[in-house]
Regions:
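N-terminal intrinsically disordered, cationic/polar leader segments
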Residues: 1-99, 109-141
Length: 141
């Protein structure tokens, strides 16, 4: 089943840089909250939130949290109803998770332009390592 959707909006929930420099080593990337999924049933919207920290020797030098909102078409939403749930397939979550992660990467690039933190590029994350199951949303009538 092909799921029709649109990337409806992006919310920068948190962004901060702290003392430190990306030129220091070792530079490490850690996902503080990883990828979290949520939904707005009435709006037929899936929300993917990416949280990440950049650390140097256990000191956070940058933190970011971005929520991406994906509006599902009414026909696709209805087509995913199964046994009292709207079941969002994990393969679709991989797709929109990847879009969300790439969006976060782009925001970091834009927010750090002209600083030494701009040399940091978030690594590729394989969505099957952070999303393990379909999303099951109880039907609300």
């Amino acid at each position: 089943m092909q799921i029709e959707f649109k990337y409806s909006h992006i919310k920068l929930d948190q962004f901060a840089t702290f003392n430190g420099t990306a030129n220091q080593r070792p530079l490490a990337f850690q996902t503080s909250g990883g990828i979290q999924t949520g939904f707005n049933y009435a709006a037929k919207t899936i929300i993917i939130t990416v949280s990440a920290d950049v650390k140097v020797e256990d000191q956070i030098i940058m933190t970011i949290k971005v929520s991406s909102f994906f509006e599902i078409s009414p026909e696709s939403w209805e087509g995913m109803k199964e046994d009292g749930f709207v079941v969002i397939p994990k393969d679709f979550l991989y797709h929109i998770g990847g879009l969300s992660f790439s969006t976060t990467r782009g925001i970091i690039f834009a927010k750090t332009e002209g600083t030494d933190l701009n040399s940091f590029i978030m690594p590729v994350i394989y969505m099957d390592q952070v999303i393990h199951a379909d999303m099951r949303i109880p039907v609300q009538e």
